[in-house]
Structures are given as structure tokens and as C-alpha cells.
Amino acid sequence: MSEDDLKVPEELFKDVKFYVVGDIDQKVVQLLKSGKGKEVSYNALATHIIAEDGDNPEVGESREVFDLPVVKPSWVILSVKCGDLLPVTGFSPESGQVFFGVTACLPHLAEDLNALWAFITFYGGDCQLHFNKKCTHLVVPEPKGAKYECALRHNNIKIVTPEWILDSVKEKNRKDEMLYHPRLTLYDAPEEEGSEYENERSSRSEGSYSDRRSPHSRRSSPTSSRDASPAGRRSPSTKHERKSELMFDDSDDSSPEKEDRNLNWTPAEVLPPGPAKRRLQPGKETGLINLCANVPPVPGSFGPPDARMVGAGAGAGGGVPMGVERLEVMSEWNSAARTLRNITNNTDTQQPSRPSNVAHIIQSFSASSKGVVDHMGNQGQSGIPNQLLLKAQQQLPPEAQQQLLQQQQQQSHQLQQQQQQHQMAQQHPMMLPQVMQMHHHQQQQQHQPPPQQQQQQQNQQGFPQMPPQSHQFLQQQMHQQMYSQHQQQQQQQQQQQQQHAFPQQMRPQQLPRLPLQHQQQHVLQQQLQLQQQHRLQLQLQQQQQQQQQQQQQQQQQQQQQQQQQQQQQQQQKQQQQQQQNQQQMHQQYLQQQQHFLQQQLQQQHMQQLQQQQQMQQQQQQHLQNQQPLQHQNQQVNPHQTQTMLQPPITSAQLFGHEPGHDIPEEGFLVGCIFAIADYPEQMADKQLLATWKRIIQLNGGTVDSALNRCTHLLCESQVSNTYLQALREGKRCVTAHWLNTVLKKKKMVPPHRTLHLPFSFPPGAKPCAQHIISVTGFVDSDRDDLKLMAYLAGARYTGYLCRSNTVLICKEPSGLKYEKAKEWRIPCVNAQWLCDILLGNFEALRQIQHSKYTQFNLPDPLAPNHHLVHNLLSAWRIPVKISPEALASLRLQLKQKQADVSVQPPSKRPKLEELPTPTKSFHLIQHLTSFSQALNLCRLSST
């Protein structure tokens, strides 16, 4: 039936006032109006919000502030098809649902199709039988079928098993689809069908998809389980194909051909050749070119290039300072390093088959760097690193080395002659003209290159084995040496001319000149050493200051931590004192209340005696019969008073049944004897009371009106004689809400919520009558429990929040209601505030701003305060004992029931007993087995 053919029943939506959020189909609006629905212009006036976009701000406001149901347009269409208003819980458009955005295809699931379909649609997803582009998930039990093969070709379609849906619903969170791939499912197949599977494998191996994994390869990760190639839709497979797909077994065939084929079971696992080649390219690029990167840094090369050039070009005479000479040596060292680096690079590119020579050059060069730096101060006036020249000369051919040695011998001979001339000039001043002539003659000889040098240059040019870079390097070093010698000779010539011009005036200063130069150099060296020491001292001082600052900061942090710890300890002490004071006040209040109740009971008893004088004889007989029972109770009282005076009991010390017994779920109330009291409305309704008894008996328990034989007392309030007597006798006092909880869990557990225990004021009292309460952050059963607690305390509950509300109960400090409450200055408290009021702590009404009521994100916000209920929980310290005979008889009864059901299943369920027509409250209890909801319904109907 299409949407155009839908016929809306008359007055189907007569009680619906809808508000549309966003853009929806106008046919949906027409269906609502055809069913007498009314559209409103403001969301606060509506009863239903119709929306497609769950993230719209108006949707959150309607749900959070006004507590209105938000449904999708499909709710309207399906309600029309069903002819009745459907529940709104399964039609929420909000994005926080488990299967929001999931469109699942469910083929080959005839048995579980309805259940899985309901799970997905109820939690926000869509289902369909056709496999098309809208599908996001394919749900199949086994890795086979035409739809499965088609889904493998699309990365955007996720393939899962039905267990993925069930586990996601249990956890209330969408599970990872990769963990539920059907290929990960292990199953057995008959061995004799292996030949058919081999034929099918050989026929499919030429297709567009690969075979399945072998048992050895099935254990690998399922991350690459799909092919990335696009493909169109496939026609449905025939019956023969489905039969052949069922007949396969890859667990026994272990041939090498099969294993080789199954290693690459999908194209996604085969590594393409392109990336593999690219990963090998960096290894090819690593050769001998990067060897120069390992050369150690040059000492002294941190200065700017201009300063190094100036230092290299300056003269190296006797009066040059040590710093200039050091710069000159460093510049020459740098030029040698650059030349050697160029030699290494060219050698690597020209001779790739001889990397050992290059490595030897670099190793010798790096090893000699330290010696060059240490020898700089002792180089004399030449400033040339001799060790560097020797290392470079070792790389030359033998003939070139001999010529260089001859040249160095000539230069050293010239230097010795110059020194002898200086000494002669100092000792014999009259021989100055002859010395000048000899010096001038040597200078001319130096300016004119000797034939040996010319011949050496020609020989160097004729060597075929000598690299051009080393030849250039030697020429540069020789020119620099000659240039420095030339400058020295010019300076010496000028000095000799001055001495010759003024021999008498300069003679006293002529003798100590050279020692003064050495002294100046020594002084400069001392100054440099002092400067370095001063710098080191400054660095040490800075480090000490930083360490002191760090120590001070650490001390300050430690002091702050100690102060915070002290403050926390003080706060804890204050809180403990406040709790002790509250406990004392509560105990005093309970004593006063019990005394007041006893006085009231005595007065009522006296009035009854005065009004019923004719019944005195019967009352006396009744009292005589009760004397033995009272005597027994008095003997038990000392033991009970000891248990009541014990300290508060924690939940870890409470028991249900004995831990060693294995009790079946069908009879989990075995050994429990219930007495029902203080439920006047339910006691008056005989039909409701019979339902309670029948449900208890069906789960293994019994109901008895005598209090002395019972183990559990179902009561609503603590203000009654029956409750006081049961408390003295050590009975377990619980409410019908606790019974409803254990019926759901199928296990008798101690009370762990406030509603599981009777409240501490009479049923007619209303301690919170002045409050209008709203709730935020609580959902499902927690929200229903808070509604019932507010009703029991006499407060008015509203699903929305407005300025007239007096209290907002929050689960966490967030949300739209919380922000509005802060803006309107409405007190925001946790659920413990309402729990304390129900359990007798009426001081919470005045202490609504107390710090313990503003602590949110509690692990169990509806749990009772153990300081207020320790007397109620003392009976749960002793587990309920079950005799082996009772447990054996229970198991025998359960087996007989199962046998009867299996032998002759009844076509129609027989009636257990003749009962009148059930009312609405009984109908709810029969289907939901929820005592708390029935209680709430009865009270609301009475009010």
C-alpha cells in the first residue's frame, strides 16, 4: 500500500497537537490533519514534535526543556497503517541512537528477520531486503551469496553477522564491524564435498574476485577484506549456485598450490609494485657523496666571512698580534678543508670504484684537525699549518713530493740566512750597509722565480696522475707562503733603513726590540686567557643562578602542595564533624518521633477501650494467648539490640541467598516467606493482592500472614507497629519496588536503591509539598523512579522547566535545563537530596545549598545513605539459608514442568483461576510485572 492510498481512520490523531521542525513531506501533514490532528505554532503547546533532523536546536529544546516526544514522519505513516497510535520510543530522529545512519540489508534470515528488523529500526536505523546504493551494512550469517560477493567490491558497505546487531543492542553502543565479519566465523563442513569445492574454486579463480582464506590464513587481521575496484549489481544467484556455495571445505586441503593461492586471498593484500620500488630508491641514493658530511666542524670558522678574508690577507710580520695570526691560520685551515671537500666530491663522482682513498683522506684530515689547532700558537711568523701541508703532500705522486721537499729546503735556507743577518746587525751595527745589500739581493732573487721552481711547475703540469684540485691547492699554499715572506722582508728592509739613517739614536732601542715583541705576544695571550676565564666564570654564575631559581620554584611548589593538603584535611574534618552532628540530630529526631508515635498509639488504644467496653472479655482472652509470644520476643530482644547498635553496614557485607548454592532462575525466591502490610489500597483490592501472591509463588516464594514465620516484610512506611515489630525481630523490610527489581533480575539481591526501602514518614504526610521539581540528565528507569519519589514526598513533578520550578535535580552539571536554572537562580541539586528526605533527613529541606548536594556525576545517584538506613540493612548481613531437601524438590518440580511442556504442548494456555474482568492496573501488572508502576497508577487514579 503506497502513501497515496492510505486511509486515515476518523479521529485517529484527535488528541495530537503536532509541531513541525524543519522540512518534512506535506503528505505527512495532510495525514495528521485528516485524522483530526491540530498543528500549533509553538513547541511548548504541542504534544508531539515531528522532525527529520535530530540535531536541530529546536529538537533538543523540545525534548530537554519541555519533555516532549520527538518522532520521525514514519511514525505517522505506520500509525495510519496500523490503525492506532504507535509508541513513540522507537521513532526518535536524534543522532545519538545506536543504529543512527545505518541502512541494513537482511537476506537469508528467514527465522530471525523480524527480530533483527525490529532491533535496527527501534534504535534509529533502516532495513530493506533489496541490495542497492542506499545500503551501508550487509547482514549475512555466512561468507557466501551474490550480495556478499557484490558487497566485497565496495569499500563503503560493511559486512557483518547478526551477532553484531545483538551485541550492539546489549552494550547500547555500536560495536566495531571488523570484528563481526562473516569470514571470521569458524564452522565445519563434510570432507566428501571437497571435490566440488575444488571444482568451484578452479572455476572462480579466473573471475574478478579471489578465493577465501585457508585455515592458516584465516587467523590474520580482517582489515583488508574488500576489493577497491567498483562493480555493478549482480543478478540473484540460482538454487544450484546457492547449493554449490554451501558445499565447500577449506579445512582439510593443505596442498602447496592451495596455500600459495590462499596467501593472497584478496587483491587488497597484494603489495603493488610501484610502492615497493619507491621504498628501495633511498637505499640506492646512499653512496660516497655523503661522506663529507662526517667531516668534523672547523674550529674557529664561526666568524663572518669578511673577518676570515681580512685575517687571511693580513701580513704575518714580527709586530702582528696573535689574534690576527690566529685568524690567518684559521682562514688557511678553512680553505684547505674546502679544497679537500671538493677533492672528495670530485673523486666520488669520477671514481666510484675507489671509495677507500676518499675515506682515508677524510679520516686523516679529521684526525689532523686537533693538531693544527694546538700548533697554531707555535707556527712563528709564517702562519702556515705544516701538518696540513704534509697530509696533502702524502696524497701526491713521488716525483711531486721530491720537488716540494726541495722547494721547502730552499725556503728554510733563506730563512736561516735572514736570521743570521738580523743577528749580525744586532751584534755589529757597522755592518748594516753590507747586510742591507745582501738582503736586497735576496729579495730580488725571491721576486725572480728560480729555474727550479719553473721546472717544478712544468713538471707538475706534466703529471697525468695528479688531480687538478690538489694541484690548485698546492699552488695556493705556495703563493700564500711567498707572499707572507715578501711582506716580512719588506718590513725588515724598512727597519734596516731606519737604523742606517739614524744609527746613533735608535741603537739603545734596537737591541730589546725583538724581546718586546715576544713580550707583547705573551701579554696578548695572557689577556685572551683571562677573557676566556672571565667568560667561563660568567657562565658558571649564570648556571648557579638558574639552579637556585629552580630550587626556589620547587620549594614554592612543595609549600603550595602542603598548604593544599592541609586545607583538604581541614575540609574533610569539617565535613566529618557536620556528618556526625547530622547523625546525632537524626537519632534524636527518630527517638522523639518514636516516642510521639507510641503516645499516639496509647491514646488511640485508650479511646478504643472506652468505646468498646463490651469487647473486654474477648480482648483479655486475646492478650492471654499473646503472652507466650511476647515472652519469646523478650528473650530475643537482647540479641537484636546488639545488632541494631552495630556500626553502619556497607553494601559489600550484605547477602541474599547463601553464596555456595546454585539456585535456578525459575525459583530464585526459594526460602523466602513474604508478609504484606501497610499497603491499604492494595489490600483493599483483592484482585491485585491475589496477583502479587501468584507471582511470588511462581518464582519459588511463599506468602504468609503471620509475621513470626516470614523472612521478608513488604511495607511502604516506617511508621507502623508491624514495621517496628519486624525490625526488632530482624526481618528484612523492603518495598514492592524491590520485589519488582529482583523479578527483573531473576536473583534475590540486597536493596541498593532508595525506593527499595520504606520511607520514614506516614503515607499521608507531604514534606516536599511546597516544591515543584524538574529533572535533567536521567533517562528510562531512573527518570521514572525520580517521578515516583517526588510523588511520595508530596512534591509536584514537571517534565519541563520554567521560572515557577523550585528545584532542579541534575545528574551532571550540563544541559539546557541546567543553564536555564542557573540563569533563573533555581537551586540545582543531585538525587541524594530527595533520597535523604524520603529516609528521614528533613534537614535537607533547609540545607538545599549544602556542598554534598552539589556533587554531581555520582556512580549510583539513587543509592541510599548508609548512615540513615543501617538499621534496615542489618538483617541482610545474614544470608537466607536453604535446606538441601527444599532445593532438590524445587529442581524436581522444574524438571516435571519442562517434561510436561515437551510431551504435550497446550494449544491454548488454560486459566489458572476464575477471576473477574481485569482492570487497567491489573492488566499493566500482568504484562509488565512492575509493582512500582502499578503503585503509581493507583495513587494517581485516587488523586
UniProtKB/Swiss-Prot annotation:
One Pfam family in the UniProt entry: PTCB-BRCT
Domain BRCT: 8-93, 94-182, 664-756, 763-851
Record SUPFAM superfamilies: BRCT domain
Composition-biased stretches (Basic and acidic residues): 198-214
Motif (Nuclear localization signal): 730-747
One Gene Ontology cellular component annotation held by this UniProt entry: nucleus
Principal location: nucleus
Main function: Involved in DNA damage response. May function as transcriptional cofactor in TGF beta signaling. Accentuates Smad2-dependent transcription.
Subunit structure, as described in the record: Interacts with smad2 via its last three BRCT domain-containing regions in an activin signal-dependent manner.
Protein's name according to its UniProt entry: PAX-interacting protein 1
Organism: Danio rerio (Zebrafish)
Gene, per the UniProt record: paxip1
